[in-house]
Amino acid sequence: VSRSALNVGQARRIAIAAQGFAGPPATSVTRAHLRKLISRIQVLQLDSVSVAVRAHYAPVFSRLGPYDRTLLDDAAWSHSARTPRLLIEYWAHEAALMSIQDWPLMRWRMREYQHGRWARKFVEENPHLVEEVLAAVAELGPCTAGQIEAYLEREAPGRKGPWWDRSETKWIAEALFSSGELTTDKRVGFSRHYQLAHKVIPADIYQREVSDEEAVLELTRRAVRALGLGTEADIRDYFRLAAGQIKPALAALVDAGEVEKVVVDGWNAPAYLDPGQTIPRVDRGTALLCPFDPLIFFRPRVERLFDFHYRIEIYTPAPKRQYGYYVWPFLLDGQLVGRVDLKADRAAGTLNVVGAFAEQGQDPSRIAGPLAERLRTMASWLGLERVVVGKRGDVVKPLGVALRTTR
């Protein structure tokens, strides 16, 4: 098979294989499986929406099957001599979990965010407040923005002013998170507990120096590997690099033979291929994908690979939503064949399928059986007793039948 010119089917199979959809492990999921998956996909995006399950848990389930979520919690938000912390939070894509070993690869971004990611002027103009927040965290240990604010009010009761409200304490703490001076020690519920970064990150990692150029080169290399192949725009998006960073990095990797430049039929830009990635001959991969799954989080690539137009509709008023509030694309044998609007009702013990829709040209009855199986597995994983099917969409009837007739 020529590797210099690929059709979209080949590109799609490469992308799915690179993202680790080979099938769940034969044994129960362990910390070693999690470590291997992170080294492959690099990031687990964090998001506050928990209508079905929080976003960072879902890509692990989609690739490895049911697992104990405390495995991921412990990897990200706890540390002991026996089980050292594996993951750390940072702006790796959006807010995301990434390998703690890769912290030094983000130093250039921390310098860029020296005064935070947002409200930079406010942070820049209030250096004394920055120092006070750092001193508060040093004194308190792991703490929320609210606890920092309460501490500062106690320590300086006469200093009440426009700054002393929760949101601005939060701005400062978030700015210090972005600049790498604070990090997340743990989360309780989903509330972030800040700590001084050097107290969370092992000294050998914290002190490791990586030049900006070397870091960007390595991130580009990792993005190509995680994607399998992608255009410059796809690769750039994975770690949210700038155009001025990605162009020289890709050129250097092509020159070194670490990345192959290829043409994909119908794409109007060249693609870059991981030379270690074989081209699968068979379409594989069946999974429900959360909206922030790395396979689909860059929507233009999803359209090119799958001919699948996808937009999250959380912020769309309910009457104007086409498919639903929190819609999971359904990957069946390497094709995106449908969409499922899911909601977990924990009080009732049900996983509610609010709506289920087949893509144009797809047979709803062919989708229903494998979808029922995945939904039942997901419900069990989330500790829910059953799947309840609503009324919206052309897949709900055959799905209801499939759920009743198979066990």
Where are these regions (language model features)?
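Long, charged, low-complexity, helical-prone intrinsically disordered regions
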Residues: 1-407
